[in-house]
């Protein structure tokens, strides 16, 4: 069924298709019996999938990645779609329109996306009001970024303001300094710039705080950020954001689409490399959320055994459809049982722990 729906949706410009899907999801969420039925059909049911990470109970490890539901307008839909949690955003302290359209492109031959959305959102205050009015049944993280018009020198106050507004209402917060679509944002990943931002957000809220990093960092930069996250007692790291690399793409004419971040399978190999390096560096001292190129249960299992406590997807959901999260969760549960693991936590990092020293 979904392959036909996808072919029809792919006839529409990507951002218009996105809005259409959102309208359908909001309609579904508004009808409680339908929402409950979908949750029974698509939601995770095996208790072996549940885990407690940074003090939050997750019914299953695969969540919706930030960027899909930027303003939390479909909060009730994500549990019904089979996700174990959802990350809303990126939101900024002030509303902003993002970059001019067109700004979202399908790379169909690569099952990938290119986006240069630019943090279009209604602002942290609007999201806070929405979160206060409605609490879904799954954990809801919030991804916060810097307002484009805010100068880099005032980034600390900008992130602090967002944390103040949404922190008390989120299951966890993610500090996003890694989108390639806000000028100068990735420069904030340098430790001397990142330290005051993370310290300010940590001081502003008791909610678990994570940092989201780019896949294009050098190994030494990855190590520095991992060490900083441990030093500041962060809850974890989200790895990774989209990549600016165009290596290996097969979709014709991609260079003519202009700048932006690539998500989906072209990112997978680097995302796994980053995850393994981070886990080898920090072990169980931080929770690692792996995102980037996860399409199948095999992909998900590779990330879990490489050190990911939680997973996220966006592009895989677009190409995979409504059963995507369910199929991955069923595959993870099957591998846990077949491998003799008593819990998801036991499997996290198991492949790395077996590596010879």
From Swiss-Prot:
Membrane topology: Peripheral membrane protein
Subcellular location, principal: membrane
Single Gene Ontology BP annotation: 'de novo' UMP biosynthetic process
Localization terms from the record: Cell membrane
Sample GO molecular function, one term: dihydroorotate dehydrogenase (quinone) activity
Catalytic activity: (S)-dihydroorotate + a quinone = orotate + a quinol
Binding site for substrate: 70, 115-119, 176, 181, 241-242
Positions contributing to FMN binding: 66-70, 90, 143, 176, 212, 240, 264, 293, 314-315
Keywords assigned: Cell membrane, Flavoprotein, FMN, Membrane, Oxidoreductase, Pyrimidine biosynthesis
Active site: 179 (nucleophile)
Coiled coil ranges: none
UniProt-listed InterPro entries: Aldolase_TIM (IPR013785), DHO_dehydrogenase (IPR050074), Dihydroorotate_DH_2 (IPR005719), Dihydroorotate_DH_cat (IPR005720), Dihydroorotate_DH_CS (IPR001295)
Record-linked NCBIfam families: PRK05286.1-2, PRK05286.2-1, PRK05286.2-5, pyrD_sub2
Role noted for this protein: Catalyzes the conversion of dihydroorotate to orotate with quinone as electron acceptor.
Subunit structure: Monomer.
UniProt name for this protein: Dihydroorotate dehydrogenase (quinone)
Source species of the chain: Mycobacterium bovis (strain BCG / Pasteur 1173P2)
Lineage summary: Bacteria, Bacillati, Actinomycetota, Actinomycetes, Mycobacteriales
Gene name as annotated: pyrD
